[in-house]
Amino acid sequence: MVAHRSNAISQSTIPDELNSLLLYSKELGLDRMQIQAAGGNTSIKVGDTLWVKASGRWLSRADQENFMVPMSISSINSAISLDSCTDNDIIECIIPDSSLNSVRPSVEAPMHAILESKFVVHTHDLKAIALTLSGKLLPKLQEAFEGLDWRFVPYIKPGIDLCRRLQSLKNKNDKVFVLENHGLVVCGDDLSELKLTMSDIGKRLESQFKRSVEKPQVSRKRNFNITGTGYTFCDDEHINELALKPNWRQRLSQGMLMPDCVVFLGPSIPSVDPYEIGFREKLTKLSSSDLPLNSCISLVDHGMIIRDDALKGTEEMIRCLHDLMSMLPDDVDLNYLNNDIIQSLLNWDAEKYRQKQNIFAQ
């Protein structure tokens, strides 16, 4: 099935409201607790046109050319109504524009299209995500959102699957959705009001966490050579702290908690003892795996090392894991993404495309 393409639309018809959304998108993208690397997406509806973030773009660079893709809302709705709908069918709903040059829309474009509000903002809010990662933490999430019209959405694959899940759950009054292991979706017909809602949610979530600003542990002096192994030492002491705390190392080696962590870092973060026999050979072998596998390694008690060919955004995603670990109590079991979910993400053409958009060699 191929969705009908609408008539071409000129970039000159972009409304002032879209420019305001781009400014807000950049603001969100510069807040690492809301957005990490190429994650998150925003949109605005103008008539039957949906302007949605292009796949692989960074919200922190929302003022750059071809950040938004124009799409036909009616074509997306027609495509989604068919059980046979695929990602390619959604891509066919792009309104032709000679300046786009094969740019793809965010995989979340269907979700943006089926939500009736003019503006839709989807962030990977780490505080919201943290409170979805354990049954013991869900009461804190419910307390934070008390009095708001909101929906909790159990984890489901991003894209068409998430879109259909929201279709089955939502009603017209729902403006806030909390996605398990994934983030926030906030809707509104007025951008100023949406921003106020986002600010209110931020304060509500902040109230559920104890404020503690601690200096990161300083990694030990690295008196071993990893030159030629395909890895380089990380200079960020916050990131290095992930390798210094046994509980954090164990959690990272068990699996991943967020879809984008899988896409940029692989299924888990391996731990390696720098004093074990064959240490350099082991690193060389690990660095030969297809990306994003083994993008970073925990050197036990010494810090993190990052692959020389790692994707753009790798360091941002590792810092995201530090922020998550810092918020999570040590005594709670975590809801990791299972192997089927991980393989689905790693083998998904839409995510492979996003990875290609974030190769340093480009």
Each model region followed by its residue ranges:
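Glycine-rich flexible loops
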Residues: 1-362
